[in-house]
């Protein structure tokens, strides 16, 4: 928000310097980001009187002028403007003056052999306009010419400063000059002199579909669209960063800046020409845009709308994007004599959706998005009509309003004890003292609140402009603290202070990350947003910034493989990575978020190769699978592998479903050779995916970590190997489970140590060898005690799997 200090002083009688005022506003929550001192544009520029004008002897387009600047002697200035002549008053930049608008310092010198001691300025050289066709002639801009030698700052309104304020979302009143003036008055106890908002005449009901909006129109005849607005209006708009257009549009913009209520003027004749029908108040409506409905805005940009956008219509023809921008075809032009003046309160949510959908953010939309008080909607329309009446001999042919208007406000209860408890005492020379009642009342009254005393405190009726922000008791307490000064209150912390802590699931997730890192894998983070895919049911987001980030990802492994490709192309020996992240499935109306741990083991993971004579040694299936085994052993979780042949990503003979506690936890396997070849990845590339939620559930069960004492064995163990021939589709995990069950209570450990396939066994047979370790806690086992248990194991395998014993 750009705030002109001169305009602000017209609204509130404040005498503070611009620096003091900026500090007060910043301390009160309106951060001043920049101060533009306009007087710097005209320092050293004074009123001059051209006494003579002669042709330059050495240049056809230059003139030699004698100019009186109020000094003892007149000065000679060489000027190149075609409109310079004797007898006029002009702004003259004297020697030493600096003109920031054109980055020029005036020096005495010569032009084509003739001395020149100054420069006659144009409006653009003073930073007042973007372009100028000649020098500024004061007789054309003002009726009363100041004395020669007078600084021109006041003459051109440059005795001003513009403050750039950062307005937070909870203070929409700060987007108006009246709102800032009220704030300054509350901070400085200065007197307000706001423009009077007259009560509006009777409004006729507007019988139209308004899509939840509060909508008012007025028919005004007798305007002149081609007429410029007065200089004071143009100056105020210029200070606020808005270009002047014509008197009608400028007045609507002025009311928006002054009161915070955006207005819009439609050309009545243009509407009739556009729709081909007579236009009355009932012709207007508000509705969602139709799919693929076209719209050309005031910026001449053609837009294709959809139902997310709310539009204002005339005879069902879209003439404005509600709260954002009007249409080019209904805009006020030089031939406009009759307008329909719109003043409305559109839903902040709908305006925000419309603005995002079309990619437009305007001065109007920024105000509607933050919320407007409906109490001033009609009053601002009347304010604009009064300004139009001052400019033109116009008349109003009717006013109409429809939709849900202002509601009866409910006073807020402010308890004295609650305020003192939350803020505490203020620090004074005599010690800490609670705020006095009259100080509290003075602060709230300065904000425009109406107070009524109660037994516990006050019943507070907030002003309409602050009801978007002040709707709870604590909001009123904050305002009191802000106006008194936060630095005036003593610092105190709640007692006792509760330290923060991690939940058991958060601790478990952090431990998982550490364990994977300890195995040599590097943790990465990838974007949750990806591009579209024909073969993947990805969920599209509503307003993507880029086509590459337009959908929610359904997996992590695709991006992980691309990361491996990039790293190997960068001459990395290998790439072993993992990520803890979310994937998304379902429909746009019902999105399902799933947490997983996904990773890739690719290439050489070792940093040195001295043990392999400098040669690359690819990890085999069991080495890669051992990474997961080490993590699960640290978590005291047991995984078993089940054959997996229907995953298109993985090698059909080298993939497994990982089972924990009888339920699938995820998968592990070698990348399918065809996919590895397409991506130019090594054949020994392995993928894994684990269900994060199930892992966290398993590691955070309350009965899981109960300490159980188990003494170290003091007697030796006895190991025996057992090789069996079984069907090719027999799972080693099933055999191990059967061995453990049959080997109780002496069997301490069993592991697969060999797997053999050969022609001598047959196509459908395979040999699997296991190493069994027997031990007793109390005595050294002899063969007499081991052999019966070992025979029991062999018998169980023969019976359950039709196993042929090889040893």
From Swiss-Prot:
EC number annotated for this UniProt entry: 6.1.1.20
GO molecular function, one term: ATP binding
Residue ranges constituting the B5 domain according to the UniProt record: 407-491
Localization per record: Cytoplasm
HAMAP family listed in its UniProt record: Phe_tRNA_synth_beta1
Family: Belongs to the phenylalanyl-tRNA synthetase beta subunit family. Type 1 subfamily.
Protein name (record): Phenylalanine--tRNA ligase beta subunit
Organism: Synechococcus sp. (strain CC9902)
